Design a protein with these regions (language model features):
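Short helix-capping/hinge motifs at transmembrane helix termini and TM-loop junctions
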Residues: 47-49, 74-75, 119, 142
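Transmembrane alpha-helical segments that form the membrane-embedded catalytic/substrate-channel core
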Residues: 65-73, 133-139
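N-terminal transmembrane-helix/juxtamembrane module of multi-pass inner/ER membrane proteins
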Residues: 1-39, 51-54, 67-96
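Alpha-helical transmembrane segments in multi-pass membrane proteins
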Residues: 55, 59-63, 67, 152, ...
Length: 166
């Protein structure tokens, strides 16, 4: 993505989100919804004594840990640092930890954990859509490049597939 494309994309996103009451909350809403669904799912598993709770906790935690370790090793700059243009929403400049996207990786790992526990097609589709919204917002808000989000998705899917098959 070029600087001009980045500016055009974030300005378009900014114009749309400026119309929303509580823009910062609106941008965080899908992530908070994903976390709430995950917590509710874990509570259901806990109260029913379902042993799948172990994988539903461990696999996303491993994914989160792997992504957290990889980010400084890769050291890719975020688009807003690279182009010198602030993103939409809150941000911390100069950290150089863009790839892979931790929000997207976590959302994908949570979606896979919930699909593992509740393998109904409607649940799987809803979680996949929520994950896609979270990843898309990371790009459209200027927090990440598409490659950051795709790397996070791929990594989460591999870790989840391996973790849920062992």
């Amino acid at each position: 993505m070029t600087r001009e494309q980045y500016i055009r994309m974030t300005e378009t996103t900014r114009r749309v989100t400026d119309r929303l009451p509580g823009r910062a909350k609106a941008l965080r809403a899908p992530t908070l919804l994903c976390a709430a669904i995950y917590c509710a799912s874990l509570l259901c598993l806990m109260f029913t004594g379902d042993r799948r709770i172990i994988r539903a906790v461990i696999v996303p935690a491993v994914c989160f840990a792997v992504v957290t370790v990889l980010r400084p090793l890769i050291g890719k700059q975020r688009p807003y640092d690279r182009y010198g243009v602030p993103p939409v929403g809150a941000y911390k400049p100069g950290k150089g930890k863009s790839m892979p996207s931790r929000h997207t990786a976590s959302a994908a790992a949570i979606a896979c954990a919930i699909a593992y526990v509740f393998p109904h097609p409607a649940v799987i589709v809803c979680m996949a859509l929520l994950c896609a919204v979270i990843g898309s917002l990371r790009v459209l808000s200027g927090q990440h490049d598409i490659s950051d989000v795709l790397a996070a998705l791929a990594l989460s899917l591999v870790i989840s597939l391996v973790g849920n098959r062992l």
